[in-house]
Structure formats: structure tokens, C-alpha cells
């Protein structure tokens, strides 16, 4: 119903949540946006790119979830923009309007090594196995969204798997089975609580550059705060 630069007012005909992702359709192009305010039947959305060409009456599709990122093998060795578009797979020097790419390669195979076994009791963020991503051991964890305790029914044998292949089957307290792959989604604005202790950085990372080490020292592992 209104367009001011990257801020668009949308008339909605259903439930809409704060920070929900939506797509504004402009011909064959879909522009990603985020709900920043809800006021009755109107939602104010902020578009992540140019709104040139968007007109009153364009259809808007709400996705029912917040801005999410995919977590899995390939994440640590890729370059992304702020929407987790893989820059290495995008064509040209500049990003095309409405162009989005898959953040992780679903066809690449990774050498999976199990660390859990059948019968283990696990909770969210417990390790099920790992893959080598470069020189780093990339831990494959119980999905962060899982609540309570689960029993490991089976874990895939060591070998090569794609990120969407099932590497473990977990059983909850109701006896329901859940297939777990090497990838999971998580909303970027929600803190991950799947940890017992959060260590604080305590050691200075010596860069050898005096102006950094003296005036702007950096802790190994980031700020941690």
C-alpha cells in the first residue's frame, strides 16, 4: 500500500510475525524482505535490495519463518554475503537483483566419521560425528531445535555422504524416530542455547603487527561477549 525507498507497507490477510521473511514478486523476480513492524492489517517490511520497479498491487508471499542460515559442512570454507548467498557460485562481478544461491553444495560428498553409537543418550548440540573441512574437524551435532533427551537408534558407518543424507536416527521419549542429516537451519536472530558452558577468550592473538598488538589487541576465538 506504500513504498518509501526500501520500506514497503503491505496489507496482509493472515497472521504475520515480527521479523518474518517475505518475498515481493516483481514480474519473474522475487525480492527478499523482512517484517520490521506489524500494525493491525498492515505490515512494514524492509527489502534487502533495490525496490526500483516495485508497484502498488504487487503480490507478497510470507514464508512463516525468520531469516535463517544453513549450518553444515561447507560453511567454514565458503564466502557469503549477508543473506548467505554463496558468492563463489554467483555469476558476474555484481549481484543481480533478486538472485539467490544455495549456501551449501548438496551434491558434494564429505568423509563422515561417527563419534556416537547406538544406545547413547543425547541432547541438542551433542556430537554425532565429524567431517574434515580443510584442516578443521567440523562437528555434526544433534539439531539445536531438539528438546529433551533422545536415544541414538543408529549412526551411519564411516564413509562419504552428502549433507542431506541421513547420518543418524534418534528416538525421543515418545518413541518417535527422527532422521538427522549433516545440515540444519537456524534463525540468525535467535541465540543458540545448546551448550553447557561458554568459555571466554583469555589469550591474546599475537599478530606481530605492533599497532594491532599494542593499540587494538585481539583475543583468540573472538570477543566472546
Language-model segments: residues:
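P-loop NTPase nucleotide-binding/switch module
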Residues: 90-126, 130-133, 140-145, 162-223
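Conserved, well-folded catalytic cores of nucleic-acid-processing
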Residues: 3, 25, 38-41, 50-51, ...
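Structural motif
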Residues: 21, 44, 59, 77-78, ...
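Short polar/acidic secondary-structure junctions
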Residues: 13-15, 27, 133, 145, ...
Amino acid at each position: 500500500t506504500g513504498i518509501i525507498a526500501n520500506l514497503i507497507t503491505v496489507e496482509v490477510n493472515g497472521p504475520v510475525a515480527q521479523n518474518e521473511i517475505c518475498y515481493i514478486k516483481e514480474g519473474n523476480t522475487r525480492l527478499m524482505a523482512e517484517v520490521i513492524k506489524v500494525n493491525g492489517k498492515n505490515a512494514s517490511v524492509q527489502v534487502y535490495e533495490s525496490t526500483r520497479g516495485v508497484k502498488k498491487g504487487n503480490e507478497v508471499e510470507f514464508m512463516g519463518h525468520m531469516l535463517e542460515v544453513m549450518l553444515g559442512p561447507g560453511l567454514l570454507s565458503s564466502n557469503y554475503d549477508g543473506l548467505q548467498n554463496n558468492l563463489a557460485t554467483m555469476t558476474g562481478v555484481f549481484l543481480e537483483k533478486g538472485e539467490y544461491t544455495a549456501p551449501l553444495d548438496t551434491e558434494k560428498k564429505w568423509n563422515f566419521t561417527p563419534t556416537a553409537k547406538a544406545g547413547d543418550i543425547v541432547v541438542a548440540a551433542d556430537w554425532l560425528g565429524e567431517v574434515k573441512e580443510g584442516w578443521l574437524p567440523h562437528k555434526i551435532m544433534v539439531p539445536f531445535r531438539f528438546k529433551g533427551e533422545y536415544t541414538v537408534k543408529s549412526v551411519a558407518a564411516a564413509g562419504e555422504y552428502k549433507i542431506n543424507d541421513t547420518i543418524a536416527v534418534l528416538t525421543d521419549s515418545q518413541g518417535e524416530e527422527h532422521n538427522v542429516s549433516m545440515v540444519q537451519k537456524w534463525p540468525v536472530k535467535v541465540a543458540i542455547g545448546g551448550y553447557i558452558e561458554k568459555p571466554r577468550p583469555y589469550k591474546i592473538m599475537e599478530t606481530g603487527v605492533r599497532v594491532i598488538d599494542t593499540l587494538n589487541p585481539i583475543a583468540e576465538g573472538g570477543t566472546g561477549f
